[in-house]
Amino acid sequence: MKGQAVSQAELLNPQHYQHIDSTVDSGRGDGKYLDLSSVKSVTAPNGHRRIEAVIYVSMPAANMIQGLSVQYDYQMDRSLRHLINVHDNSLKQGDKTPYISIWRVKQGNSGITGTVNDGGTYYNNGQTRQQRIYAENLKAMILPAEFGDEKYKLPNLMYKKAYGIAYDDEP
């Protein structure tokens, strides 16, 4: 992510960065920020859609910002709308499977897979900081995108920015 350094002050500009609301944010500038100019759809296999973007995780108290270049893959047959449509068709054919089964299916596999392609760590003033990004931290911050979990919010926001519709509203 060379050349992608960003400062705490820049992240607070809503025309370039969107703050991703989180229950763990203190309200003092910490949290996840989506670089709005970086969101783009990329080539994906049939039945999938893919989006790349850059997100920043701000931790002002630690004088640290982590920049992450991420890619999310969306299985179109796992969207909530698609699963509901399949379930409704099964009901019409006499199947008695309860609707809660859809929730369980989504919790088992949300249909969204995320990967981190690159990353960098910076001080709050935007200068590069020599620090690795650990897998445990990624799991705590953004991955995996589990249905019903807060980490599901970011890939859905990216999808809506790229395609104009929420992933789970896709038929």
Set out the residue ranges of the language-model regions.
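N-terminal secretory-pathway/extracellular module detecting exported/lumenal segments
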Residues: 3-68, 73-171
